[in-house]
Amino acid sequence: MDHSAEKAAANAEVPQELLEEMLWYFRAEDAAPWNYSILVLAVLVVMTSMFLLRRSILANRNRKKQPQDKETPEDLHLDDSIMKENNSQVFLRETLISEKPDLAPGEPELKEKDSSLVFLPDPQETES
């Protein structure tokens, strides 16, 4: 039996090309350089994120320390439009108040405080 096993091993020789391909495919290298490069990359990512987080925290802290009464251009534009509207209302009110209509004797004249009551409904009436 020993002779037949040796004959089978001699006949079943693997070509050199196939051996080299198998060696390359099933290679076992030292993984230390790869592990170190991944470790360095992870450390760089952590340091960069910590740096960005710190900058964000400091920016938020500085923004809170600055005075809040600074007006943005949008606020200034809104203030201008409100002032123009108020000026036109004041002008309209002055012209209407200065021109007093001829009232017949005995007709009551509406005052400014009465006009708000006339035009606005009672809150109790709107609820029911």
Curated annotation (Swiss-Prot):
The chain crosses the membrane at residues 31-53. Residues 66-80, 101-115 have a biased composition (Basic and acidic residues). Changing R61G: Does not inhibit transport activity. Does not inhibit colocalization with SLC51A at the plasma membrane. Its main location: membrane. It is found in: Cell membrane. It is a single-pass membrane protein. Interacts with SLC51A. The Ost-alpha/Ost-beta complex is a heterodimer composed of alpha (SLC51A) and beta (SLC51B) subunit; induces the transport of SLC51A from the endoplasmic reticulum to the plasma membrane. Belongs to the OST-beta family. Essential component of the Ost-alpha/Ost-beta complex, a heterodimer that acts as the intestinal basolateral transporter responsible for bile acid export from enterocytes into portal blood. The Ost-alpha/Ost-beta complex efficiently transports the major species of bile acids (taurocholate). Taurine conjugates are transported more efficiently across the basolateral membrane than glycine-conjugated bile acids. Can also transport steroids such as estrone 3-sulfate and dehydroepiandrosterone 3-sulfate, therefore playing a role in the enterohepatic circulation of sterols. This is Organic solute transporter subunit beta. It comes from Mus musculus (Mouse). The gene is Slc51b.
